């Protein structure tokens, strides 16, 4: 079983990997955009991780408002990477993603919206299909004034829904360079300001549980969740 606190970011260089470890992370999901995917880049990032005794997992974020294109990309990348994210914002995309158990994380459901991008129906779908909701801390930090308060409100609203319906939640630094990297304690401290400490702890541990689940499904002996070939 995978243990530890794992960040989700866009860090692929050796200095970034060293910084993540120094800041206290146990591992990292290195996320590429689906239209820029490079197996060579992720392989080199994994090698940097191995060199510095740091776990690196592969991720792809699919960004499109076209459902057919999104579903084709999901089929294309599901078996190529450890973690699959889809950028939200469009309400139809939000709903479709939460209906699909092939996706791990709905990223930024509030993106470019006047509301939080979720309701009780969508939260239940996420719970049923094990699709996590992402709180992107980097997006919050980059925003200003009204936009920042709007994102913060969306975070709080989505946390209430997720907690009520037991929908998984992850928090990410979303860092793309060493200057965007935050320590686990910083993200945990932020969560403590918008929800209770026990729930904050659960959120911090969710990314590693998602990875553990996907690694389990990749085993040759596992046909699907709960169905495994046992050799006598």
UniProtKB/Swiss-Prot annotation:
InterPro entries: Pol/histidinol_Pase-like, RNase_P_comp-3_arc, RNase_P_p30
Any Gene Ontology biological process: tRNA 5'-leader removal
Family of the protein in this entry: Belongs to the eukaryotic/archaeal RNase P protein component 3 family.
Function: Part of ribonuclease P, a protein complex that generates mature tRNA molecules by cleaving their 5'-ends.
Oligomeric form and interacting partners: Consists of a catalytic RNA component and at least 4-5 protein subunits.
Swiss-Prot/TrEMBL keywords: Cytoplasm, Endonuclease, Hydrolase, Nuclease, tRNA processing
Coiled-coil residues: none
Record GO cellular component, one term: ribonuclease P complex
Chief site of localization: cytoplasm
Molecular function GO labels: ribonuclease P activity
Catalyzed reaction equations: Endonucleolytic cleavage of RNA, removing 5'-extranucleotides from tRNA precursor
Chain's gene name: rnp3
EC code: 3.1.26.5
Name of the molecule in the record: Ribonuclease P protein component 3
